[in-house]
């Protein structure tokens, strides 16, 4: 992973959202290279769980985050509604174990207890929005984007941009109206937070990394334009 950082910078990316499994299982030398280049690691993308029995994984992630000092950490809660209070208690304890200036960014992914915007708004209502933010996925679904911004506007701090299929290629004029509509919602809400190109066209079993990267650069240019 570290070998890509200079190329990312050269091609106009401000930093990287570092996938947890590109760091924790990496050899010590690679971890040290990433720590040395930590200013390039804007977001740490974690897959820890928040059930009581997952405390060891949370501790390992907290140690990695302390070493890397990212501006934020992306996470998700679990999908068991009966464990809502347990997840919340462990989330708050985990926040205390992280650097004080590290923002906690909930992806509110499908299949989790916070996949609905109104549920996420209620869960975070009494927590500091500067510390406890959310991630919104932006593509061609303007109505979905509007719902998240309307419910959690002051808490939206990070965007995941997914342009996976050919219908999401911003270089094709016919695709632009739907894509532009989604980003118009973002602009209308005065968003000034960070953006990650999460997935681009070409991912799959027979994927070509150079093709995917070229597409990601196309997506980057589009996001900067709109």
What are these regions (language model features)?
Residues 4-6, 28-35, 58-65, 88-96, ...:
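Generic structural signal for well-ordered alpha-helices
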Residues 15-30, 48-57, 79-86, 111-116, ...:
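Acidic-and-aromatic substrate-binding clefts and catalytic sites of carbohydrate-active enzymes
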Residues 15-16, 95-178:
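Acidic/histidine-rich catalytic cores of soluble enzymes
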Residues 16-18, 39-46, 71-75, 104-106, ...:
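Hydrophobic faces of well-ordered beta-strands that scaffold small-molecule active sites
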């Amino acid at each position: 992973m570290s070998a890509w950082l200079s190329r990312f910078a050269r091609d106009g990316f401000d930093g990287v959202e570092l996938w947890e499994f590109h760091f924790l299982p990496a050899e010590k030398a690679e971890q040290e290279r990433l720590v040395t280049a930590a200013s390039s690691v804007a977001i740490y993308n974690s897959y820890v769980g928040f059930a009581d029995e997952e405390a060891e994984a949370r501790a390992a992630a907290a140690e990695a985050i302390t070493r890397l000092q990212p501006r934020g950490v992306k996470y998700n809660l679990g999908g068991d509604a009966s464990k809502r209070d347990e997840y919340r208690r462990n989330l708050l304890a985990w926040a205390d174990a992280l650097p004080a200036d590290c923002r906690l960014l909930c992806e509110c992914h499908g299949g989790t207890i916070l996949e609905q915007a109104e549920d996420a708004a209620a869960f975070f209502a009494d927590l500091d929005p500067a510390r406890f933010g959310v991630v919104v996925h932006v593509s061609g679904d303007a109505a979905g984007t509007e719902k998240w911004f309307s419910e959690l506007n002051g808490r939206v701090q990070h965007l995941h941009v997914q342009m996976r299929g050919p219908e999401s290629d911003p270089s094709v004029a016919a695709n632009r109206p739907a894509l532009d509509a989604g980003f118009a919602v973002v602009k209308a809400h005065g968003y000034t937070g960070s953006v990650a190109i999460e997935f681009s066209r070409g991912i799959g079993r027979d994927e070509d990394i150079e093709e995917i990267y070229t597409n990601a650069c196309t997506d980057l240019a589009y996001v900067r334009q709109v």
